[in-house]
Amino acid sequence: MPNSMWHQCLEVLRDEFPAQQFNTWLRPLQSDHREGQLMLFAPNRFVMDWVNEKYLRRIEEVLKDLNGGQAPRVMMKVGSAPKPTDPVVRSEVAPPVRVSEETEQTVTEEERSVAATVADSAPRAMSAPAPKAQAERRPVQVEGDIKHQSFLNETFTFDTFVEGKSNQLARAASMQVAENPGGAYNPLFLYGGVGLGKTHLMHAIGNEIVRRNPRAKVAYLRSERFVADMVKALQLNAINEFKRYYRSVDALLIDDIQFFARKERSQEEFFHTFNALLEGGQQVIVTCDRFPKEISDMEERLKSRFGWGLTVMVEPPELETRVAILMKKAEQANVKLSSEAAFFIAQKIRSNVRELEGALRLVIANAHFTGSEITPPFIRESLKDLLALHEKQVSIDNIQRTVAEYYKIKVADLLSKRRTRTVTRPRQVAMSLAKELTNHSLPEIGDAFGGRDHTTVLHACKKIVELQETDPGIREDYQNFMRLLTT
């Protein structure tokens, strides 16, 4: 059985599993077939063990169907295939093609506006030439090695990152990239709502790469910085220096890639930079507030390349993680915070880590200025404006409308006595979201759903928790709702 059979197997599996599952666990596998045995190579033991447990049986079934009823013996090990193989399904993604890097596209007004508003901190390779040279429009000459500024925040490390179920996969993938930059997970695409820790993980990767190799050239920047540097380089007739700078790094970390939307020339330059880095075995890491395919006004060829490596969602933190974050931040601030107080804040602030930390800072400041002890009543008074705003933003009505629209049913169906599966499951999802995202009690939630008993709400919440463990479709739906309602 040639290795192309493995690619056919991947085509089948891709249609069966959600995109994130497929890209995370199956796509990185490499294959080698010899004498009736298919050896699958995983990038690390974590992936190998997970595939063995969750996917191996289905892989064997698909291979058997594709091979005329005779399944090869499938083995797994950590490492790389002994000869070049292509573990990536390319049927929908064109292979990298060397394109002329010069384009007829011009800089848009929006890109010029960005360049005018972003503070001037361009790399030395693109520094403005002397007035005389600028008047003659001569290309800027760069002598010797390029000096890189990482702009990494040294306080954002893996040690200071609080891990929980919501970010466990993202942290594991980030750590793997830091240990093996330019490896299987290239590019690494981290996406999720605001304030969930994507930027922290990105800095942690960069800091860990530098810790392991102090000579590594790591560049972190927000996407508007890339746009501003490109516009300045064009204005100074220094586009070659711009390209040389960004393509000479060992790891390029771009934050908030969605900012490239509607900026055609920036997308063009990043497309070629992206290709050059991947072809050179250099690591690319990007963050975004949404899944790659959901980014509007961005070229399809660029969005497709984001999916070549590993795409991981960073989810809103669950209660236990929120409590752990608060306790860790309080410890760093040398503030005594009881577990009762931490739980109170964590139960009230559910949306993201940034808002959670902001709430804690406000409570600590009020306690410092008033000399008060941090207790639940004191916290409630300190955060009354924030809690009122939070409750207003995420209401049961909003949840019901969002869920009904998503499942293409009516809000009245959610409130009715109907018990068909097409209504019952969305109703349970909406109840669970109401419990997690609002401060309403179970009886209040029950009243909002047609006068149901609080035990019905509790059963619905438990059911959705169970289904998220066993049903990929429900898990993906729930994650989508959390993003829609909290960002």
From Swiss-Prot:
It comes from Marinobacter nauticus (strain ATCC 700491 / DSM 11845 / VT8) (Marinobacter aquaeolei). Residues 151-367 are annotated as: Domain III, AAA+ region. This is Chromosomal replication initiator protein DnaA. Belongs to the DnaA family. Domain I is involved in oligomerization and binding regulators, domain II is flexibile and of varying length in different bacteria, domain III forms the AAA+ region, while domain IV binds dsDNA. One of its GO terms (molecular function) is DNA replication origin binding. GO terms for biological process: DNA replication initiation; regulation of DNA replication. Gene3D superfamilies: 1.10.1750.10, 1.10.8.60, 3.30.300.180, P-loop containing nucleotide triphosphate hydrolases (3.40.50.300). PANTHER family: CHROMOSOMAL REPLICATION INITIATOR PROTEIN DNAA (PTHR30050:SF2).
